[in-house]
Every structure is written in structure tokens, then in C-alpha cells.
Amino acid sequence: MTNIRQILRHVLLLLVLVVCGSQAQAGSARIIVDTRAETLTVMRGDTVIKTFQDIAIGRYGKTYFKRQGDNKTPLGNYRIGWINRDSRYYIFLGLTYPDQEAADRGLVDERISEAQWQEIRRALKEGKIPPQKTPLGGYIGIHGLGQGDMTVHQQYNWTNGCVALTNAEIDQLLQWVRVGTPVEIR
């Protein structure tokens, strides 16, 4: 009788863990950056958790064809790859840019070599951060202002391709994100 109870207890525990794990996964946050509306929205499923207004993006707008140093924000789907809490921009949420689509376009357009394409592909396949120093650019993220000028932030798109919030906003955003959080920039 005790063996049956122990087995049932283990089965019940396993079911609880599976249900809780799937609910946690379903309840995970994702970020949508709308470059046209200049907003960053935190979503959980179809529910809006928080929208940050008046974000800043790259000083020369947005693109699907990013090049290193073009000061444009790359459009696409990424994940938060790392979090730097000691950044000159206060806090930096590094994105897994370039993604496979950017690498494919870069190879077709001959902006990157086949070896660079393979490196990006391998890193993404292994769940690692793709190479950040290719002709496609890198070190794209969501960050605060650091010691930057709030007036400039409120009036201009000023970044080198990143998405910028105020320091207070990035602090608030941190409660919903972690390494692995999906980020769509559109």
C-alpha cells in the first residue's frame, strides 16, 4: 500500500510540475518595439502589461538591411541575450542580433562572407549570442540614458541603432524581462 501511495505522490508531483511549468512558459513576457509609434510594449500572451511611450531608436531610422555603423535600428525578432547592469547607458539589455534572416540577407547581398554566415548560424542554433563584430553590426540592445541628456532623448532619435528608454523606465522594464525574453522590433 505504501508503494502505491509513493508512486501516486510522485505522479501527482510530476503533474503539478508539468502544469506549473507550462503556465510559467505561457505567462512569460515578450517585448514589442513599434518604431513608427515609438513605443515599447511588454506583453504576456495577448495582454498588454505596460507600454513605454516616446522611446528613441537609431538616429537614421530603422532597416532590415543593417550595416555596421549605419546608426539604424534593425527590424526583426530577437531575444535578450545578456544583461549588463554596469553600462555607460545605465542598464543594457543586449539582443541576439544579427538573427538568421539578417545573416541570410547579408550573405545574399555579399555584406558578410560564408564563414561569417556559418558563425552566426552556428551560434543561433546553439542558443548562443551571435558574433557582434561583423559588417552587419552588433551590440544592439535596449538601454537607458546613463548620464545622457533627457531633452535630447525626448526630442530626437539619437542612438547608434539601439532602443533607448529613460533610466527609470529601464528599471521598470527589468521586472518583466530576463535573458531569453523575446523581442520583436517592427
Describe the function of each predicted region:
Residues 2-12:
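Bacterial N-terminal signal peptides that target proteins for export
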Residues 10-20:
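Bacterial N-terminal signal peptides
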Residues 26-29, 36, 53-82, 123-127, ...:
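N-terminal post-signal-peptidase region of extra-cytosolic proteins
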Residues 33-35, 48, 73, 88:
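Short, surface-exposed loop/turn motifs at beta-strand boundaries within globular domains
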Residues 35-55:
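N-terminal targeting signals for Sec/Tat export/insertion, comprising classic cleavable signal peptides
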Residues 43-45, 83, 175:
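Surface loops and adjacent helix of pleckstrin homology
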Residues 51-53, 78, 91, 140:
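Short beta-strand segments
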Residues 72, 86-186:
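Exported/periplasmic cell-wall-interacting domains
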